[in-house]
């Protein structure tokens, strides 16, 4: 489903609202692919820094090709300083505009953490967990959307 070279944009602002489970599994998949000699790296764009499963685990699995706009993760910094990850550090307020202007090419995936959903006949409503970040931009730009349901958060 997620392919080598895909650009992914995520919900959240700092670890709040970041999808977590998908990236724990994606880093495991990357390790298996690399062990089999198959390349696998993705680009990750967020509204701020993210969490260990997105930055640290993915960097340790050598599954990150590019990351922007900001990181506070020690494991990610280590791999970036080794030259394993291309990284762009910028003012967080510029990210959504740069996405809309196409600075990062096409966004294959928007990955959004939600606390619940309501399905209707003509529309669906997704309830974000604790922080949206750049969600309104990424869901419009992405070719495909993955929704990660975090049941720890109450949708009400």
Model-derived regions, located:
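Conserved alpha/beta enzyme-core scaffold
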Residues: 1-156
